[in-house]
Amino acid sequence: MSKFSDIITQLLFDAPPREINSVYDSLVIITEDTDNDTLLDALKRCLVAKRLPIDVEGSPTIVTEYNKDGAKYFDPFKKVLFSVDCLDRVGLDIEPHESETTPYQEKLYEELQKYVAKNFPGDSACTVLPTGDDDELAIIIVSSKFSPSNYWSGYWKSEYIYSPEERSLTGRIDVVVHYFEDGNVKFSTQEFIDKEDINDPISCIRALESEIETGLDESFSKLNQTQFAKLRRKLPVTRSKVNWGKAISNYRLGKDAAQGK
């Protein structure tokens, strides 16, 4: 790749996943749209690497190297083949596709769907795909939330390789949280997984991710009480009293509390 392509790719890959399109739009302006093919190619590689879902016939589908077929991608459970519009993140040129799935793969996918629906409240998707290496299956979960009015975005991606024959589960979990109100704070963490003697990979994933989520909650709480506390602006000392009893409704905090916000 050229130096220009390297820089473009790095900027897109470093962006919080739910804000990639905003970064792309800015890059189009900065580069004066002189090399749109390079930008689109980098955007597509970024979407695939981060497993960001594509809307295919009204439901999310994850595109990866495992379900690539020529210039298109297929969903083995929807039985469709499609191309990708990277900007709008939708599937185009959709056509029927007979993808072979095993009963065990379908069983894992059904269990995974139930787990994701119950535990990931954001924009979520999951899949189970053969890796092409013996009996190995890639188990992928991705979920994200974006609240621009509250100046934050969040992203979770967990990806595992499970071998039914060896009963091994390896993988990695990536979590990114971005706060950008009057500042710019990005929290990024990775957890690597390596487990053996696993007969039920979905139950194992459920337990692992619950433990990791608890650890993240504790880390955020500690961070909020230490490093974040140092960043907060200290309020000025006015040496005047606030009549909370009679005038609380005049203050924004009181109004929000009264309205249940």
Curated annotation (Swiss-Prot):
Tagged with keyword Cell cycle: no
Keyword Ion transport annotated: no
Pfam annotation, one family: F-actin_cap_A
Keywords noted in UniProt: Actin capping, Actin-binding
GO terms of biological process kind: actin cytoskeleton organization; barbed-end actin filament capping
Origin superkingdom: Eukaryota
GO CC, alphabetical: actin cortical patch; cellular bud tip; cortical cytoskeleton; F-actin capping protein complex; incipient cellular bud site; mitotic actomyosin contractile ring
Sample GO molecular function, one term: actin filament binding
Cystine connections: none
Complex formation: Heterodimer of an alpha and a beta subunit.
Family: Belongs to the F-actin-capping protein alpha subunit family.
Functional summary from the UniProt entry: F-actin-capping proteins bind in a Ca(2+)-independent manner to the fast growing ends of actin filaments (barbed end) thereby blocking the exchange of subunits at these ends. Unlike other capping proteins (such as gelsolin and severin), these proteins do not sever actin filaments.
Name of protein: F-actin-capping protein subunit alpha
Source species of the chain: Eremothecium gossypii (strain ATCC 10895 / CBS 109.51 / FGSC 9923 / NRRL Y-1056)
Taxon lineage: Eukaryota, Fungi, Dikarya, Ascomycota, Saccharomycotina
